[in-house]
């Protein structure tokens, strides 16, 4: 997705950026609801909190980027930074977090988490907005999209309960 976004121009670049935002937010909502609680226990608070911090930094960058013209040099620079941050975050998950979770959880539990993760990604909105507040009360005040995001989180939590 990053390579396609780098090469795109005009309206197509804006559309691809919106798709990237949607995919990143769906991914992070799913991780936030399913992986992080388990990770804090299995991998430790420091590792889980480092991943949360990385996600927060990427979210901040997305908020900055949404205010910019996608054709601007500043947008392109921030896009390159975002790509580096996302790649570094994924590598940290793969090398520091996932192996510790996998070592402490049963195969059945890991499969359950995988199913819940996929359900979460399907339930999450396809047009997320990175500047949406991150609390349920603020989400309700922020508008319909935010309420949908809360409903997606609730659906994920319900799915987790029904698969446990």
Language-model segment annotations:
Residues 1-164:
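Small-residue-biased structural context
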């Amino acid at each position: 997705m990053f390579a396609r976004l780098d090469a795109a121009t005009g309206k197509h670049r804006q559309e691809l950026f919106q798709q990237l935002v949607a995919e990143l937010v769906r991914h992070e909502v799913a991780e936030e609801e399913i992986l992080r609680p388990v990770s804090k226990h299995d991998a430790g608070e420091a590792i889980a909190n480092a991943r949360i911090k990385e996600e927060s930094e990427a979210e901040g960058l997305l908020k900055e980027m949404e205010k910019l013209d996608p054709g601007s040099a500043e947008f392109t620079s921030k896009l390159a930074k975002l790509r580096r941050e996302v790649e570094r975050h994924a590598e940290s998950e793969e090398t520091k977090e996932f192996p510790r979770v996998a070592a402490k959880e049963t195969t059945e539990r890991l499969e359950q988490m995988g199913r819940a993760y996929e359900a979460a990604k399907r339930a999450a909105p396809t047009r997320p907005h990175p500047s949406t507040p991150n609390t349920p009360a603020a989400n309700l005040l922020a508008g319909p999209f935010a309420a949908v995001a809360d409903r997606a989180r609730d659906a994920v939590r319900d799915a987790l309960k029904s698969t446990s």
